[in-house]
C-alpha cells in the first residue's frame, strides 16, 4: 500500500474514531465562519478525493485486516453520500474496483460494497448509468437472490432499488436478469414507484437455499 495513502487512511480513521474529542474545536472553528474545506486547507488535512483513494487502497490491500477494511469501507460510504464525491468515483478510477468487491469472498465486504453502490447511485443518473455500463446490475440481482449472507442480500436489494428508480435503462437491464416468477417479459416503468417497490419487496422475500 502506498505510504502516503496509508498516512491518509490513518488520519481518516483517527478522525472518525476521535470525533467526539474534537467537537469543541470544530465548533469553535465553525463559529468563526470556517467551512470544512477551509479548515482542511488550513490544517493540511487530505481532500475527500484523497480519502476516497486511500480507502480503496486499503480495501484492496493484503496488508490491511478485515476489521480495518470495514472501517475504511464505512468512511468511504460516508464520503460518497455527497453527490459530488459520488460523481468523482469515475474520474478517480474507483468504480471498477468497487464493483469488483461485490464478488469478494468475505460476506461483510460484499455487504459494504453493495451499500456503497446503493449510496452512490441514489438519485444520481450519472452513477446509475455507470452501473449499466459496468454490467454490475446482473451481479446485484444474483447477489440479492442467492448470496448466502442475509445482510449482503439486503444491501444488494438496496443497491438495486436505488439503481433503477427513475432510470429506465437500469430498470430494463435488471428486468432481463430477474429469476423465474418475476416480470421479465414485460416493460416495467422505472418511474412507477409502486411497481418498483413490488419487485424489491419480492426480492427481499426471495427464498435462498441453505448452504448447510
From Swiss-Prot:
Listed GO CC annotations: cytosol; endoplasmic reticulum
Alphabetical keyword list: Cytoplasm, Repeat, Translation regulation
Pfam family membership, one: HEAT_EZ
GO molecular-function terms, A-Z: adenyl-nucleotide exchange factor activity
UniProt repeat feature ARM, residue ranges: 23-64, 83-122, 125-165
Annotated GO biological process: cytoplasm protein quality control by the ubiquitin-proteasome system; regulation of translation
Major site of localization recorded for this protein: cytoplasm
Statement: the UniProt record of this protein carries the keyword Iron-sulfur: no
Subcellular location: Cytoplasm
Family as reported in the entry's similarity comment: Belongs to the FES1 family.
Job of this protein: Functions as a nucleotide exchange factor (NEF) for Hsp70 chaperones which accelerates the release of ADP. Required for fully efficient Hsp70-mediated folding of proteins.
Protein name (Swiss-Prot/TrEMBL): Hsp70 nucleotide exchange factor fes1
Classification of source organism: Eukaryota, Fungi, Dikarya, Ascomycota, Pezizomycotina
Amino acid at each position: 500500500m502506498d505510504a502516503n495513502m496509508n498516512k491518509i487512511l490513518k488520519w481518516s480513521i483517527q478522525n472518525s474514531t476521535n470525533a467526539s474529542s474534537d467537537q469543541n474545536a470544530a465548533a469553535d472553528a465553525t463559529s468563526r465562519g470556517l467551512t470544512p474545506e477551509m479548515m482542511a486547507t488550513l490544517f493540511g488535512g487530505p481532500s475527500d478525493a484523497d480519502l476516497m483513494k486511500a480507502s480503496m487502497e486499503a480495501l484492496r490491500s493484503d496488508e490491511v485486516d478485515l476489521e480495518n477494511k470495514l472501517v475504511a469501507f464505512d468512511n468511504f460510504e460516508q464520503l460518497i453520500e455527497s453527490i459530488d464525491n459520488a460523481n468523482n468515483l469515475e474520474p478517480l478510477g474507483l468504480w471498477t474496483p468497487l464493483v469488483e468487491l461485490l464478488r469478494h469472498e468475505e460476506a461483510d465486504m460484499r455487504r459494504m460494497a453493495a451499500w456503497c453502490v446503493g449510496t452512490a447511485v441514489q438519485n444520481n443518473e450519472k452513477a446509475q448509468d455507470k452501473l449499466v455500463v459496468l454490467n454490475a446490475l446482473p451481479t446485484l440481482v444474483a447477489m440479492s437472490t442467492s448470496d448466502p449472507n442475509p445482510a449482503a442480500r439486503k444491501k444488494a436489494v438496496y443497491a438495486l432499488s436505488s439503481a433503477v428508480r427513475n432510470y429506465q435503462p437500469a430498470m430494463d437491464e435488471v428486468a432481463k436478469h430477474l429469476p423465474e416468477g418475476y416480470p421479465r417479459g414485460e416493460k416495467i416503468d422505472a418511474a412507477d414507484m409502486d411497481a418498483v417497490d413490488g419487485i424489491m419487496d419480492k426480492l427481499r422475500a426471495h427464498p435462498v437455499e441453505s448452504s448447510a
